């Protein structure tokens, strides 16, 4: 053994070839600060071996290196800019030493090589991959850019266009594509990986392969003519401006850095990467996006822990077909859980099967599946008008019309047709779980399972714990949701549960703005372009359905009369009374017509202004800041109340539910991350300016306490250790 660290070791393999093996404790390798330092120490040993002829890098895990240790990011990003810059210089000196070894080097890459893992293998001369490889640089999705030389080496290896596509979009690619663009030099079966790697190294050692020529372009300026450079970078900047926009600075910074570094050799190019990375790491956007990643891991980990002793359902059923039922059936079947889809008429069943077939055909058109796979999946969805097969079902979700009498009757009837241990769930969005459970003989086997539309796209499923729901029931439904590829978040029962409960105060803020003379078009524009929502409130109401919102608004007002009962006729009432139900009937705040792809396209409709004039004061202009404050304060206050009342268990789960269920702008990180970034004192000052507007704008006492004690909602993070100690970790 030449060297042994905590996460890697170095040893002789054969005939002058050494192997450097990443083998961290636990299931995966991460390129954390300690591993970077350990890699430096291993290279120090290696540089002294006079009989060294070649070096093989490999992993003892199912994945090569999954990336940097993102749990370290928040503390690293608090280190002063100069110290963070110094540490990056140190880390890059380690990868440069790997790249500068006087012998050929090869990385045998299996599974994942992402982020820092990808940057590590870019420093070797050759890369041999297994067919299951996913390799790429996802840093821009975390609000940063490659910091270990990825923005320097990748363009010099692949050319500007391919590298820009991967870096700016934060993409990873499979083995076949990586081979095609030159990111790897060969693809071999896992069992042949080491043998193949040694064979390539031997060819390089004997001179049959010119490893020096392979290395040289990575050390030099990017080989691009002025015209080629102008075209590549102009197109890339245009695409990034269009897709990322101003709220996500990392992709544009990465493109501009690669452009500026193109005319320099490695050292100067790395300096430019360093100068761009450090300011990005100190942005609120980076902290928010890293926070989302960590919250996602927390939520998924909690679901995994909850279901560790639970068998995933093997057979499911959906009550009620149509678009929603068909979407749920598709998602279950697509992820490998056969499903019975029951309805009371053929027309609805046909609609449900058509929806599932349409979604599968889209997968076929995109080349994700072949005809055989399509036929296999669709055959696991069994449409029926009766209860045949329900005695074999492990879990049933009811998705019939949003009417308590109908739902209770359907659930009670179904309970008689299934085994005693079968779990029943309701996809209700507003009806209290306790009310539905009252119709059942086994309420402990019942809970809420709230999907979001469209089911195949929306990641969140709210699992609602009723007063009598057993832990096992919750765990079984969480297991099914996880198997479906969804992110399940368990909430306690209340009107609207969590997501709808916090959404309707936001809509109430919108209604008050319109009542006071705001133009809905400007409100939408500000909330989309300035705050960052994917849709403004008017457009969102049209998509949800004005009739659906009108009904839900009444339910919420009955549930929370003190805050959500209104004493005036609002825009939702006016549109509902005029039978303008949104996209579903082509008339809402906008008029809708199908575009060339058959998707609804919104158009101005002057008739709306006349309708809204009856429920609003004279038009007046509101500043962007005032619109944002009046829209967001009711939502934020309600989110805080939900945490205080135990409806949602943690800030992390609340923020992920908002991001995954409502499209809360990820660069804000969620309501609690946004609050912590603003500071509760600043938020309180802002909210108090609007408390005259009514109870929705009154800040909860718990948030006032946070302000008095200067406490954040997320645990405080300490800056990482001084950079000098990182070097010798």
Swiss-Prot record:
3-hydroxyacyl-CoA dehydrogenase, as annotated region: 311-729
Marked site: Important for catalytic activity: 119, 139
CDD domains referenced in this protein's UniProt entry, alphabetically: crotonase-like
Annotated pathway: Lipid metabolism; fatty acid beta-oxidation
Residues that hold substrate according to the record: 296, 500, 660
Alphabetical list of InterPro entries matching this protein: 3-OHacyl-CoA_DH_CS, 3-OHacyl-CoA_DH_NAD-bd, 3HC_DH_C, 6-PGluconate_DH-like_C_sf, ClpP/crotonase-like_dom_sf, Enoyl-CoA_hyd/isom_CS, Enoyl-CoA_hydra/iso, FA_oxidation_alpha_subunit
Self-association state and partner proteins as the record states: Heterotetramer of two alpha chains (FadB) and two beta chains (FadA).
Function: Involved in the aerobic and anaerobic degradation of long-chain fatty acids via beta-oxidation cycle. Catalyzes the formation of 3-oxoacyl-CoA from enoyl-CoA via L-3-hydroxyacyl-CoA. It can also use D-3-hydroxyacyl-CoA and cis-3-enoyl-CoA as substrate.
NCBIfam families: FadB (TIGR02437), PRK11730.1 (NF008727)
Protein name: Fatty acid oxidation complex subunit alpha
Lineage, highest ranks first: Bacteria, Pseudomonadati, Pseudomonadota, Gammaproteobacteria, Enterobacterales
